[in-house]
Amino acid sequence: MNDSEFHQLADQLMLNIEETLDDFDGDADIDYETNGGVMTLSFENGTKIVINRQEPLHQVWLATKTGGYHFNYRDGVWLCDRSDRAFYPLLSEAASAQAGEEVKFA
């Protein structure tokens, strides 16, 4: 993957997250802000989830209340480099725990 492909894939990932949060109709208040390739999700209880690009490594990193994860793009999916778990299920799990209700990203 070259830098241009990485940027396109990472941009699409961030856009999907934004669209999911814009369409979220649950009771939890989840705000997001994107600045310089870093997206921060802020929850009512004061916790945060941070998603950022690591361009030199062509990775996307996810930092949640319970841990940090590094994702590589393989076979059409962002997969954790340690567990091979996909990005969206991990993000959904973390966001649901931090929001106190189900939040589903896909």
Curated annotation (Swiss-Prot):
GO cellular component terms given for this protein: cytosol
Pfam families recorded: Frataxin_Cyay (PF01491)
GO biological process: iron-sulfur cluster assembly
InterPro entries: CyaY (IPR047584), Frataxin/CyaY (IPR002908), Frataxin/CyaY_sf (IPR036524), Frataxin_CS (IPR020895)
Keyword Iron appears in the UniProt entry: yes
Top-level taxon in the UniProt lineage: Bacteria
GO function term, MF aspect, one: ferric iron binding
Alphabetical keyword list: Iron, Metal-binding
Function, as annotated: Involved in iron-sulfur (Fe-S) cluster assembly. May act as a regulator of Fe-S biogenesis.
Family affiliation: Belongs to the frataxin family.
Name of the protein: Iron-sulfur cluster assembly protein CyaY
Gene name of the record: cyaY
